Amino acid sequence: MNRFVKGIILLSIAAFFAECLEFVVNMILARELGEHGMGLYMSILPTIFLIIVIASLELPISISKFIAESNPKLHESMLRHAFRMTAIFTAFSTAAASIALPFIPVFDTYHPFIKGIVIGLIPVVAFTSIARGYFMGVQKMGKIAIANVLKKIIQLLCLFLFFQWYSFELDMAVLISLFVLVVSDVVVLVYLYSQFIMARRALSGQQHIHLRGKDVRKRLLAVSIPTTGLRIFHAVVNAIEPFLVKGALLAAGVAGTAAIDQYGMLAGVAVTIGSFPAFIAHSLMVVMIPSISEAYALSQYDIVLKRLKQSIFITLGYGIPAVWVMFQFAGPLTHLFFHSPEAQYYLQLLWPYFLFHLFVMPLQACLIGMGFVKEAFYHNVWSHIVALSMMYVLGSMENLQMLGIILGMNTGMILLTSLHYATICKALKVSVFLTGGTRTPRIEG
């Protein structure tokens, strides 16, 4: 069994446990916060993730790609320069967030301490990214797997202890829920860095080649900037989406409180359940980026095509049964959160969104590994423009409302998957059935 398959299996098993824990975490949140509180929690979360994405600078991807493509003798010098770059960028990001957050109106309706939580997350996420990227690049997926499970265990334990022993007002309960995220990320930081330090000590006696800081920054940023742009775009869309959905529902005649509740059912229940199988897709993505990067750098295009086929067959193998189960048992699954017929209805209607989302992640990993980050970004822009436009136009129709929102989500995900797949087939000079040549011309534009 090669490293690629081993990495997928290891990460998938760990991610399964992590997703099970995440499922329980969301059940606790749903019961403790209630429908309205869950809507508030899910509405602020995308904005927090947007700030975190900017702080991380997508270093896990750029560092893992550098490590996979380059001589091991270059790794130590690259890591030193990456630390310096991260320290400078983190100082700037923390200062900028401290100044800007008080003026962001999204936080006005929440506990004032939430701003401090977000600021505290910035350095934690930034420095964790270096260790995470290193272990991804050397394909030591066991460290990543343990970190992912550890994060969910700490989050679950903290939530259980806080809500078991104490009773909070709604705004304080939301604050506690977000504070737990910081605690779990700090624990992951400590674990990964302890492993990272031991790994570097093991390499200390080996010969290293010195790199210029300018060259390292240029190479890392060549990947980090477009992938960060892609993540920022996703985070911006996710931050806008709650307000766009609520705005569309208000235009359709739905009351404000009911609109928040419906969005809580959509994002907090239906999407949470539907996204459960995505732990395998995410595992595929993490393993594929360094694997595709290494093969593409060595012009081993047949290996790239092999990895693509493997990812598609794996996705078909688990994706179709998973979506079928969610459709058939939507009622019992949604009742684990709330006894809400709306959530069951949303989960069943979103099956195309969930199925195609499972394909998007490995396809996007293939594009990133091949160096087509810009193409991936354009695909996301166009698909989200179509999706958000449809969501607002159809969602604001009185006879459609949430059905229109879901139609827009499904259409956008199908379009994004199709664009990714078509670009990869064109790059590898193969047909849509993945047959033909494997010599790769560079895509321009």
Swiss-Prot record:
Transmembrane regions: 7-29, 39-61, 82-104, 109-131, 144-166, 172-194, 237-259, 269-291, 312-334, 349-371, 376-395, 400-422
Protein origin, superkingdom: Bacteria
GO cellular component, one term: membrane
Keywords recorded for this protein, A-Z: Membrane, Sporulation, Transmembrane, Transmembrane helix
GO terms classed as biological process: sporulation resulting in formation of a cellular spore
Membrane disposition: Multi-pass membrane protein
Subcellular localization: Forespore membrane
Note: YkvU and stoA are cotranscribed under the control of sigma E.
Name of this protein: Sporulation protein YkvU
Lineage, uppermost ranks: Bacteria, Bacillati, Bacillota, Bacilli, Bacillales
Gene name of the encoded protein: ykvU
